[in-house]
């Protein structure tokens, strides 16, 4: 990271924006997953953003922007088996809001883009992770195949990376950007989230229980 900062500093002494798109996906049971994998997703999805912002802050001036792509899941209640990914993105969303509170004092604006499924290689990773989970789980074998059908239906409604890029450019062009923006959010997930938590739990249990 230090060498990256030094190379950028050789070219310019000021950045208008730092934009975060990178992240990793994980699908697994919270009680079956490897502890190293649990730590890794937070180190990348949250720790990576923290480290980049901290490193490149000297190049950000009043009027500069930071845009962080989180997930449509970030403000929602987590679903089973995608919990660790959703929690890492929720933590990233909270980090971004706290960062916005701090950096506004320096004239730097922070926004998040909460995106639904995007047609990138991550969808393939998601499918592979789901297949691996369905094959390896010993506690939820009766539920896994049904969950696979649900995830497949959610991910079928994806947008292209160019749509994300266009949305990001629009955010950067705004004189007074909002903190949160959304794109391609799944209406069924939004509907589930407005229900009482007790009802959410019951619905998920009915959907995933063994027939």
Segments (PLM) and residue ranges:
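Conserved NAD(P)H cofactor-binding loop of Rossmann-fold oxidoreductase domains
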Residues: 21-26
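Alpha-helical segment proximal to the catalytic Tyr-Lys
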Residues: 58, 101-102
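Active-site loop-to-helix junction immediately N-terminal to the catalytic Tyr of the SDR YXXXK motif
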Residues: 33, 78-86, 98
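SDR active-site lid
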Residues: 105-178
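Active-site helix of classical SDR
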Residues: 53, 88-91
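Substrate-binding pocket helix/loop in short-chain dehydrogenase/reductase
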Residues: 29-30, 37-39
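Hydrophobic positions on the long internal alpha-helix
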Residues: 4, 19, 52-56, 60, ...
């Amino acid at each position: 990271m230090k060498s990256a900062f030094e190379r950028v500093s050789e070219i310019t002494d000021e950045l208008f924006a730092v934009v975060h798109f990178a992240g990793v996906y994980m699908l697994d049971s919270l009680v079956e997953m490897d502890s190293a994998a649990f730590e890794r997703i937070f180190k990348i999805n949250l720790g990576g953003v923290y480290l980049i912002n901290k490193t490149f802050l000297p190049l950000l001036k009043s009027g500069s922007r930071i845009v962080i792509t989180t997930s449509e899941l970030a403000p929602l209640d987590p679903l089973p088996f995608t919990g660790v990914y959703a929690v890492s993105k929720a933590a990233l969303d909270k980090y971004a809001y706290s960062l916005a509170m701090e950096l506004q004092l320096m004239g730097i604006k922070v926004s998040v883009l909460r995106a639904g499924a995007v047609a990138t290689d991550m969808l393939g990773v998601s499918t592979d992770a789901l297949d691996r989970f369905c094959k390896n789980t010993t506690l939820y074998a009766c539920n896994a195949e049904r969950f696979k059908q649900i995830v497949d239906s959610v991910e079928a409604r994806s947008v292209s990376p160019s749509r994300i890029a266009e949305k990001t450019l629009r955010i950067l062009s705004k004189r007074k950007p909002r903190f949160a923006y959304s794109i391609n959010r799944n209406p069924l997930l939004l509907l589930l989230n407005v229900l009482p938590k007790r009802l959410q739990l019951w619905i998920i249990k009915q959907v995933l229980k063994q027939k």
